Structure formats: structure tokens, C-alpha cells
Design a protein with these regions (language model features):
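Glycine-rich, aromatic-flanked loop segments that form ligand/cofactor-binding clefts
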Residues: 121, 150-198
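Active-site-adjacent "subsite" loops/lids of carbohydrate-active enzymes
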Residues: 85-100, 175-223
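Catalytic domains of carbohydrate-active enzymes, especially glycoside hydrolases
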Residues: 107-133, 224-233, 305-314
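Aromatic-lined carbohydrate-recognition surfaces of secreted/lumenal glycan-active proteins
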Residues: 98, 167-176, 234-235, 256-299, ...
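Substrate-binding cleft of secreted/luminal carbohydrate-active enzymes
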Residues: 42-45, 304-305, 309-353
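Aromatic- and acidic-residue-enriched segments that line the glycan-binding/catalytic groove
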Residues: 136-145, 177-198, 241, 245-253
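N-terminal, intrinsically disordered, polar/charged segments of Gram-positive cell-envelope systems
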Residues: 44-94
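N-terminal Lys/Arg-rich, disordered targeting/topogenic segments
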Residues: 1-22
């Protein structure tokens, strides 16, 4: 009986080796992936102080680090907006020199460069005793009455002076003002009995501080000057006229005394400067004979009341008067600065040619 053929002997039913190769390939792939993963993760291992470690991946940074970065960026932004203010050196004694009235229209840098090393302060004329304004004022009343004589370059000159290392004093004649007084006789000026503007021995005119328009004009000018950067404003001629035919002055319409009118103007000025955030000194100039006498009827000054609104009082005096004026000023409890023709040996002073 013949046997049934079943194919090649030993090979027809064996499949074990092919399955083993697939398993080995999968195992090798897993090992390779694990090795690559370990090498990748090794870059992000953070070891703690106790020897343990943790993984810190870029996409999972702690919140506090992101916050720190934001804060750092914010600080950088603040630094970009930072404004640096350079403070002037503190001045103990004011050793000032009055610059020429033409300094704002000339070479102010040369004027400062010509000062001696002892000088640490300068005084600049902004408005004179005729009412003329030495800078390009924007006050409408000053423009309308023709008082503005300073050109556009005067602002740059002022900025150069106030931006220097010198302590700066702006000098302003207040009530001795021919321009505005003539333009506004009835509303602002000291007038004659006839109603026409009064004039003194030099044929110049004065503003009447009991009149609202006069106070408003002076306040506008002083406030404008305060915004130019001066460390101090020195008010001059802040009184009624002292010379001339006083009997011809019209007084019957006054609603307050001369002293009260001066104090009202001083109060208006102080209030306006406070509102304008002016942080400098406000000072006033007084003649030596009034200081020594304590008061004067014609001017309307009573020293004990007059000085209350001011930080310093400047007094023009000779070397012979200096000792007695210094002694008299002690009674008023306000800082005193003599105005001299030459520098003093010590203390504060203003040299005026």
C-alpha cells in the first residue's frame, strides 16, 4: 500500500524562528527609544540639595519664574521711562552778582563764564521799573500795552542760566510800571485828582495795588516768571510811590489802606505761586531808611507786617549802613540779604553795580 506524500520533511510546519525575530526587533526599538529619551531628559534634570532630582522641562516652568520674568520686563520698561533730575549744589550763603540788563539779549554763556570763582548765584532782570519786560512774555496784558521787549531767543538764554550750576534769582519790578499804568489808567494806575495817570519826579507811572486789575497783572507776570525755573524771585518796587507830588494823588475812591493793599497783593502772589507749585523762594526788596525807621507812610510799608509773606528781604545799603541795617533786621525774624556795590567778606549778599 503506497504512502501519502506530505511535502518536504522537517520544514512544512515550523514557524517559531520568524516570531522570535519580530519580538527581538520590538525589544531593540524599545531599548533604543528609552536610551534616546534618557539622553534627552538628562538635559532637564535638576538636582536638589538633598541629592534627589527632578525634571524641569521648558513647557512646564514654575509660575514664579514666569512671574519673575514679567516683573523684570516691567522694571526694564520703567527704566526706559525714568527721568533723571540733577539737583543743584546746596547754597549756604548766597554770593550773588546782578547780571547786566542786556544779558538775555546777548551772550549769557560768556556772562556766566566771566564771573569769579567766589560767586555762586546770579540775579537776572526780568522786568524793570519802567514796566518793560526783558523776555518774550505771553501775558496778554503785557503784549497789549507794548511792554514786551524780549525776543524769542530770551527763553533759551533764561534756560541756559537757570540750567547752570549757579543759584538763580529773577528780579521783577512790580508796581513801578509806566506801560500798563498808562494803558489802564482808571482800572489799574495811581491817578491824579483829575483822573489822568499820575507821574513821579521822573515822569514815570505806578500801579495801584488797591485796584484788582493792577494786582491781577502783577500776579500774572510773577507767576509766568516762576515757571521759568528760577530758584528765587526777588520782587522790587512793591510799594506806593515815595517821591513826587503826593498831594495830587487821587485817594478818595480807595476802599482800603495802603498797607492793606500791599498785604492783599502779597497774599495774591503767594497763593498764585502755591497753586503753580513753585518751590523756590519769594523775596522782596526794601530801602534801608524804611528798615531803620520800621515803617513809612508814603510807601505804605509797615515792616513788621510787610515781611510776613516773604522768605528773604533784600536791602540796598552802603558799607556804613550795613551794621545798623543788619541789627534792625533781626527784629523781623526773616532772612536778610544786603545789596552792596562790592562783595562782603562773609555771609549772603547781592552785588549790584
Amino acid at each position: 500500500m503506497a504512502r501519502k506524500k506530505t511535502g518536504t520533511r522537517g520544514y512544512s510546519s515550523y514557524r517559531g524562528r520568524r516570531h522570535g525575530r519580530k519580538l527581538l526587533a520590538v525589544l531593540l526599538a524599545l531599548i533604543l527609544a528609552a536610551a534616546c529619551g534618557f539622553l534627552f531628559a538628562q538635559r532637564y534634570i535638576v538636582y536638589e540639595a538633598d541629592g534627589s532630582f527632578r525634571f524641569e522641562f521648558p513647557w512646564s516652568k514654575p509660575q514664579e519664574q514666569t512671574q519673575d520674568k514679567d516683573e523684570a520686563d516691567g522694571e526694564a520698561g520703567k527704566k526706559d521711562d525714568l527721568e533723571i533730575t540733577v539737583e543743584k549744589p546746596a547754597v549756604k550763603d548766597t554770593r550773588a552778582v546782578a547780571l547786566g540788563d542786556d544779558v538775555l539779549g546777548g551772550d549769557s554763556s560768556s556772562a556766566l563764564g566771566a564771573l569769579d570763582e567766589k560767586t555762586n548765584a546770579v540775579a537776572v532782570r526780568l522786568k524793570d521799573d519802567g514796566g518793560r519786560i526783558y523776555y518774550d512774555s505771553k501775558v496778554r496784558g503785557a503784549i497789549d500795552c507794548g511792554a514786551v521787549s524780549g525776543g524769542s531767543g530770551t527763553r533759551s538764554a533764561i534756560a541756559g542760566i537757570t540750567g547752570s550750576d549757579y543759584y538763580t534769582i529773577g528780579r521783577i519790578s512790580t508796581l513801578h510800571d509806566s506801560f500798563y499804568a498808562y494803558k489802564h489808567m482808571t482800572d489799574a494806575a495811581v491817578c491824579q485828582l483829575t483822573g489822568f495817570v499820575w507821574y513821579d519826579e521822573n515822569s514815570t507811572h505806578w500801579l495801584a495795588p488797591e485796584k484788582q486789575a493792577a494786582r491781577d497783572y502783577v500776579t500774572e507776570i510773577v507767576t509766568e516768571c516762576a515757571q521759568m525755573g528760577f530758584d528765587e524771585l526777588l520782587l522790587e518796587d512793591l510799594h506806593y510811590p515815595r517821591e513826587g507830588r503826593m498831594s495830587r494823588i487821587k485817594t478818595d475812591e480807595r476802599t482800603m489802606t495802603q498797607q492793606e493793599a500791599l498785604m492783599l497783593l502779597a497774599d495774591d502772589l503767594r497763593a498764585a505761586l502755591t497753586e503753580a507749585d513753585y518751590e523756590g523762594k519769594l523775596s522782596v526788596r526794601v530801602d534801608a531808611d524804611i528798615v531803620l525807621a520800621g515803617s513809612e507812610e508814603k510807601s505804605g510799608i509797615v515792616m513788621s507786617e510787610y515781611v510776613k509773606d516773604f522768605d528773604r528781604v533784600y536791602v540796598a545799603c552802603t558799607q556804613d549802613e550795613l551794621k545798623s541795617v543788619t541789627e534792625a533786621m533781626k527784629a523781623y525774624g526773616v532772612e536778610f540779604v544786603p545789596i552792596l556795590t562790592e562783595a562782603a567778606a562773609s555771609g549772603s549778599y547781592l552785588v549790584e553795580a
